[in-house]
Amino acid sequence: MDVTAIFAGDILVQSREYLIPNDVVDVDGGIKAVRPPIIQPPPGRKLPLIDFPGSSWDFLTYFAPSKTVKRQSSSSSDNTSDKEEVETEETRGMFVQLGDTAHEACPFATNEADSSSTVSIISPSYASRGSIVPSWLKRKFLGRVSLGFVYEGSSGSSVGSESTCSLMTPSLEFPDRISFRKKDFSEKGPSRHVWEKRKLTRAKLIENFCNPEDIEPVTSWLKGQLLGEESFASVYEAISDSSVGSESTCSLMTPSMEFPDRISFRKRDFSEEGPSGRVKEKRKLMRNKLIENFRKPEDITSWLKGQLLGRGSYASVYEAISEDGDFFAVKEVSLLDKGIQAQECIQQLEGEIALLSQLQHQNIVRYRGTAKDVSKLYIFLELVTQGSVQKLYERYQLSYTVVSLYTRQILAGLNYLHDKGFVHRDIKCANMLVDANGTVKLADFGLAEASKFNDIMSCKGTLFWMAPEVINRKDSDGNGSPADIWSLGCTVLEMCTGQIPYSDLKPIQAAFKIGRGTLPDVPDTLSLDARHFILTCLKVNPEERPTAAELLHHPFVINL
């Protein structure tokens, strides 16, 4: 008989002995077969179902009984028992329980010279080790279980050519010989019905987990960053072509009547000794007026500040949670004197709060109120969880379907804004956020960078999306809405290519190119609809650019 060791961490199981003391057949010093057991082991611990290639794991239950078992022999002919003690052995081993064999008849074939040692067991559920194999060699790694590792091994006392220690036993049929050799579970093998049963179980599992009727199945998607790992699975972020929502919002929008008449490169002296010596006192009055004009559509009285989401020159944006467990975004602005930039900061805050409090639309970031302390102003806004479109195209290569869906949502928000007489003035991927449902929301977490148009050199990345009339210090449209359309064309180009417009130029070089009416490079590899949409937006003459309402009927955003 084979004496094959199975190692799983500190667990060693042998196929040599079965410690059930009722009617034991002793062949060559080893117990080969038994009748139905009398001793029932205590409840044990079940391990998860694990499958290795070409083999089958069953549920394993292990016990560590400390009692001493006396072996007794009996005669199957007269059903009388020999009371003489044959051997005493301490059961320190591990039982292996076969989960699905409780009602299977499992014959044990033993030595041909001893025909009486062949018996049939109605419930052969338990096995235990005898003595530890003193000499064995560890070979290749087979797998990992909760209790340790399983290796292929060979014993110095093993019989036969196979010495694989796999500890994998079929659940529906017990082998004719007690052996831990690998079994053939292919369709042509002796355990074909096991294979077929697994296929049926797998098919039933898939059938039971199909999508509900009210949920559109995901047919095309891209895998993103790893979110977490579990025992049997890993969880990733993913983006779908068909799961993008229909809502979009817009944040940091400046009233059109405040569009600057011209852009100057001169720095202004806001010190007390300068030509604007009374500006400090004026700043205090503006700050007090801003605080007095707070609107609180929602009463957020107690909240905790969380992780940083973004930072600009004037403001930082944090995640926050209220005492009711509601999450939102907090834009934190210092009210301390910031020198020559303080007046502009306060003007921006006043304009943004006034604008957000007026807008109520599904495509506009929801304004949730304001608060203040001694030195800081807090603006509460809707929290958008998935980050900016810029971060998304850096993680994924956005398909034309996704770009088209995002563009349609941006247009819906711009159309509402322009009808209200406002312009956004900073349309770009970094200012568009996406929630978990694929809804695009325009925002600006870098408050200062979003509307600092008095100094082109300080506009940093914003300059690359500016329209020619903005660079050339004129607003020929009256309310500036064509400037948003130009920026939208640059934004769609950015989403399609994964690069900002004029990416090969420095800011000052790009300013001269844009001012002269030189278009950014639009690759010929883009789809015809995408290319036509971008070039339609990038008309040098603002009067030739379509409105947001007209672009909502463009084939690029309706032929999905």
UniProtKB/Swiss-Prot annotation:
Molecular function, one GO term: protein serine kinase activity
Keywords of the record: ATP-binding, Kinase, Nucleotide-binding, Serine/threonine-protein kinase, Transferase
Knockout or disruption consequences: No visible phenotype under standard growth conditions.
InterPro entries found in the cross-reference section: Kinase-like_dom_sf (IPR011009), MAP_kinase_kinase_kinase (IPR050538), Prot_kinase_dom (IPR000719), Protein_kinase_ATP_BS (IPR017441), Ser/Thr_kinase_AS (IPR008271)
Gene3D superfamilies in UniProt: Transferase(Phosphotransferase) domain 1
Similarity-based family: Belongs to the protein kinase superfamily. STE Ser/Thr protein kinase family. MAP kinase kinase kinase subfamily.
Binding-site residues for ATP, renumbered to this chain: L309, G310, R311, G312, S313, Y314, A315, S316, V317, K331
Name assigned to this protein: Mitogen-activated protein kinase kinase kinase 3
Source species: Arabidopsis thaliana (Mouse-ear cress)
Enzyme class: transferase
Enzymatic reactions: L-seryl-[protein] + ATP = O-phospho-L-seryl-[protein] + ADP + H(+); L-threonyl-[protein] + ATP = O-phospho-L-threonyl-[protein] + ADP + H(+)
Active site (UniProt): D426 (proton acceptor)
EC number per UniProt: 2.7.11.25
PROSITE patterns xref list: PROTEIN_KINASE_ATP, PROTEIN_KINASE_DOM, PROTEIN_KINASE_ST
Span of domain Protein kinase: 303-557
Tissue: Expressed at low levels in roots, stems, siliques, leaves, seedlings and flower buds.
